[in-house]
Amino acid sequence: LALVLLSACSTSSPFKSLTAGPCSGEQKQLVSAHISSQISAISKQDWPLAYSFAAKSFQDSVDIFSFEVVITGSYPMLINNQGISFGKCEIKATSIFQEVTVNSGSEKSELLYKLTSVDQKLGVEAANIIEQSSALTT
């Protein structure tokens, strides 16, 4: 596993130069893995790890305590998630936008993640709730 991680770091970054339009397959895979890792840390309430996936610009303006307060207050579906799926991934200017559906049992939430790549390192800048709906139960 360490060899795979090391070899992944040594290759040229798929985020070196961003071109507007749909994400490439490799970009989508890396973005999905980054968001999945952050959501996994959030669901375990491992705030230092979850915070480490945030963009440096986000970390410069929001401290870890405020990050935890925002997540627990506005994004409880990330803590209680029972699965996530990924929709469209698109690049606009210097940002990467990824649609994410979070299933938290009786509720599904559509979020739009905004990521940036600084020095070829991905970071989550924002996650906005687009839509929340209750699952129909019969």
Model-derived regions, located:
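Sec-dependent N-terminal signal peptides
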Residues: L1-A2
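N-terminal, intrinsically disordered, polar/charged segments of Gram-positive cell-envelope systems
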Residues: F15-T19
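Exposed beta-sheet edge and beta->alpha loop/turn motif
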Residues: G83-T138
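Short solvent-exposed beta->alpha transition segments
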Residues: G21-C23, Q29-S40, K44-F97
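C-terminal motif of bacterial Sec signal peptides marking the signal peptidase cleavage site
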Residues: L6-A8
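Bacterial signal peptide processing site
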Residues: S10-S12
